[in-house]
Amino acid sequence: MGKHYLPNSAHKDEMLKKIGFNSIEDLFSDVPKGMVKEFNLPEGRSEYEVFLELNEVLSKNKTVLEMPSFLGAGTYFHYIPAHVKYLIERSEFLTAYTPYQPEISQGMLQALFEYQSLIAELVGLPIVNSSMYDWGTAMAEAALMSARVTRKNKFVVPEHMSPEKKKVLHTYTAGPGLEIEYVNWNERGQLDLEELKEKVEGAAGVYVEMPNFFGILEEEIRAIGEIAHDAGALFVVGVDPTILGIVEAPGELGADIVVGEAAYFGNPMNFGGPRAGIFAVRDDKKLIRQMPGRIIGMTKDADGKRAFVMTLQTREQHIRRAKATSNICSNEALVAVAAAIHLASLGPRGLRELGEVILKNTAYLKKRLSEVAEIPFEGVNFKDVLVRFEKSYEEIHEVLLERNIHGGFYLKPHFPELGESALFAATETTRKEWVDALIEALREVA
């Protein structure tokens, strides 16, 4: 016997009547018939059947533990302590809710305040926002901010920079019409200071990375900052924060703005995201007022107790769009909290040990790679090592994949002048036997 109350279409009929239609077909009558398609969905399956099919598809993926990867070039395999995931999956943190109401968001706001405090200590600058989308967007926002502060219309960056970062920078600066000036590298794979001096005039900001895209530590960071400041430009440093346990903080090297990637702490590679961009400035009212994103501040409530709030909310949801410093609609709060938990767990000693192990593993990788290919640039490498081959690297890479090894990042499509070159990377997770297996495979094919 049919159930006359299923389905119940009364609410649908009421809504159609309210807007002047008799049926769903009438509502969409203006859509050309040729554009209306049948779904042609297959027969439904049980949840278990769907589980089996998806599991079969997912089993085709290989993790970096099953297939050692030397890919690098911006995304790296770091070990994440088990408690990080447990803590960020707590319902107090794992939410899409923006903490607009501080009276019910003290836990999240305090966690983000701790993130800001940790990053401030790490980069050597006192004012930090609660994150950007990623390193690339943070760098692009720094370019726009430099132009606003100095009222100049040129931003100087290294030619040897991630192709993805270049695309993001051009996307951000095309609308405002900010000119991007590129400076080449010298014979050591570092920024050419003489060319920088020629191109810095009229610049709003000068950007440099530590380490640079080739994995090399720029030896003249302080001198680059002096050249920028002598020209009246802001000095912007992009940093991989995992190196900051073993080198001087960029704020102590003269940086006005520091950007970087916080997601290297506490967050998996996950196909490249999500990320959390670091954004820090020195204690200057002009810079603070022009910062993009959110800043979490500590204050006192009506009862005189400590409280955390969002402060200087110069974003488009709070003020007129044209007046906003940035149109970033949200930050990467959960990613930033994960980074803060990991950083707090490491502490100063753990951070130093992390940097030392990465440096040691990179040096071993570089030494072994020099046995089978050319290392065109001298200097100290951190994580990435640029290697040049005589044969086609695309062919070499295919053979490595057959040997269950994921090789380096192919550079020729982005830097043709470097020939058949690639970036190979190591982190604290890179095992000696992985490197040895890579070299044995390269001996046969390179």
UniProtKB/Swiss-Prot annotation:
Annotated GO biological process: glycine decarboxylation via glycine cleavage system; nucleoside metabolic process
Range of residues in the leader sequence: none
InterPro entries xrefs: GcvPA, GDC-P_N, GDC_P, PyrdxlP-dep_Trfase, PyrdxlP-dep_Trfase_major, PyrdxlP-dep_Trfase_small
Pfam families per record: GDC-P
Alphabetical list of SUPFAM superfamilies matching this protein: PLP-dependent transferases
Reaction(s) this enzyme catalyzes, per UniProt: N(6)-[(R)-lipoyl]-L-lysyl-[glycine-cleavage complex H protein] + glycine + H(+) = N(6)-[(R)-S(8)-aminomethyldihydrolipoyl]-L-lysyl-[glycine-cleavage complex H protein] + CO2
The keyword Nuclease is annotated on this UniProt entry: no
Keyword set, alphabetical order: Oxidoreductase
ATP-binding recorded as keyword: no
CDD domains assigned to the protein according to its UniProt record, in alphabetical order: GDC-P (cd00613)
GO molecular function: glycine dehydrogenase (decarboxylating) activity
EC number: 1.4.4.2
Domain of life: Archaea
Function noted in UniProt: The glycine cleavage system catalyzes the degradation of glycine. The P protein binds the alpha-amino group of glycine through its pyridoxal phosphate cofactor; CO(2) is released and the remaining methylamine moiety is then transferred to the lipoamide cofactor of the H protein.
Record-stated family: Belongs to the GcvP family. N-terminal subunit subfamily.
Quaternary structure and partners: The glycine cleavage system is composed of four proteins: P, T, L and H. In this organism, the P 'protein' is a heterodimer of two subunits.
PANTHER family: GLYCINE CLEAVAGE SYSTEM P-PROTEIN, GLYCINE DEHYDROGENASE (DECARBOXYLATING)
HAMAP family noted in UniProt: GcvPA
Name of this protein: Probable glycine dehydrogenase (decarboxylating) subunit 1
Native source species: Thermococcus onnurineus (strain NA1)
